Amino acid sequence: MNLLSGWVRPLMLGCGLLGAALSAGSIQAAVCEYRVTNEWGSGFTASIRITNNGSSTINGWSVSWNYTDGSRVTSSWNAGLSGANPYSATPVGWNTSIPIGSSVEFGVQGNNGSSRAQVPAVTGAICGGQGSSAPSSVASSSSSSSVVSSTPRSSSSSVSSSVPGTSSSSSSSVLTGAQACNWYGTLTPLCNNTSNGWGYEDGRSCVARTTCSAQPAPYGIVSTSSSTPLSSSSSSRSSVASSSSLSSATSSSASSVSSVPPIDGGCNGYATRYWDCCKPHCGWSANVPSLVSPLQSCSANNTRLSDVSVGSSCDGGGGYMCWDKIPFAVSPTLAYGYAATSSGDVCGRCYQLQFTGSSYNAPGDPGSAALAGKTMIVQATNIGYDVSGGQFDILVPGGGVGAFNACSAQWGVSNAELGAQYGGFLAACKQQLGYNASLSQYKSCVLNRCDSVFGSRGLTQLQQGCTWFAEWFEAADNPSLKYKEVPCPAELTTRSGMNRSILNDIRNTCP
């Protein structure tokens, strides 16, 4: 299958807003973008993003579109879809309201018609916002285009959902008092029954109120009529203090950065995933430069150890990977994390990863397509004999133990619960569901395993990292990427304790 990875075509759309939900006289200024995120010989994926640049909250939205070349949608996620060309999309409950400055996004996958990934006109009520029509920073194999819909028309205000678990009754049960969680810039449902960490209720992932409230400003619990956090009390924060070791300085720094410049050129690589619970290579003083502190290890109960010479749990010692090395979202398009790389002087180096929209070894992977245009910055904490050049083995709880396994003993789980040795939960889900299932099915399966292994045992931080993989990382299976070495953000060095900036030795060449 010949993949055209990373091809993105933006289109400014007319955005249909449900008139009954709008207050009289309010002026909406939403920017709506249709993007072809990936295309291969017979199919495509695309996303539609609605950004509220207006002066009031958008309460309810609807968009419609029609393919004229025979293209057809085969699956969707994060929206209720109806019709068989034309198509209409409406919210799934938790993304009904769009606070000022926030956005919602949903995606579709389909089969191509007689042309390459047609960009249809999307109709609805007028979107009044102005947005950039510049191409995405993803390397493009085709020219980008931008079209403003000049003749929008009203779309149906009542669209039934064709996505399991997205009916109005089930959606409303995940929402708590017309509130949602602004999880580092992404609106996420609040849980009704889960008291701490992340949960999975009524067919979707949700965040407990205490966990949501523990985020730094401006994030937290928001009203559907306001983007201002409603709860950040010290009592709420203290109840989940154990689930986050991020310092206040780190939190404030993380909230001030939402994007990084795109990579110009760069090196070719790909990302895999693992979490083996072992003490990492960079945890020994002999493996880091003399002016750099080694990575601290933790005990079996996740308490930091001051003795850097403690042996690895994978060799019978008491040193484990600390749970604060989970990946985390900074914005909807930027995340930070930690990774194993190939051998050499890598400890403490940071790399910008820009995902191209295709998989390294799984052609047509819907998760890799949905990940297109997103960026990660990872710090190297480990090396692996099974990690090749250009490969970044990202630390993801539930990502597979790989060559070593100290997790079964540390977490009290069976080997079978850990999923596939290489690939973890997602690989096990693909074995269970087959390799032609929809992205929403893969995500749901992974989230169920996150809840079963971590949520049921109160392993909140690990559950957050696992959920991040399904949500922000789009359950992408070994996505291809462009990368380059960059200065390390304070958010990463504060957590790891490794800061090699004094060495001023960033490499600008590909291996």
UniProtKB/Swiss-Prot annotation:
GO MF terms, alphabetically ordered: cellulase activity; cellulose binding
UniProt entry tagged with the keyword Hydrolase: yes
Annotated TM spans: none
GO biological process per UniProt: cellulose catabolic process
Compartments it resides in: Periplasm
Domain annotation CBM2: ranges: 30-130
Catalytic site: 276, 393
Cystine pairings recorded for this chain: 32-127, 181-212, 191-206
GO terms under cellular component: periplasmic space
Record key words, sorted: Carbohydrate metabolism, Cellulose degradation, Disulfide bond, Glycosidase, Hydrolase, Periplasm, Polysaccharide degradation, Signal
Signal peptide start and end residues: 1-29
EC number(s) per entry: 3.2.1.4
Pfam families in the cross-refs: CBM_10 (PF02013), CBM_2 (PF00553), Glyco_hydro_45 (PF02015)
Region (Disordered): 137-173
Top EC class of this enzyme: hydrolase
Residue ranges of domain CBM10 in the record: 180-209
Catalytic reaction(s) noted: Endohydrolysis of (1->4)-beta-D-glucosidic linkages in cellulose, lichenin and cereal beta-D-glucans
Main function: This enzyme catalyzes the endohydrolysis of 1,4-beta-glucosidic linkages in cellulose, lichenin and cereal beta-D-glucans. EGB is most active against barley beta-glucan, but showed significant activity against amorphous and crystalline cellulose.
Name of the protein: Endoglucanase B
Organism: Cellvibrio japonicus (strain Ueda107)
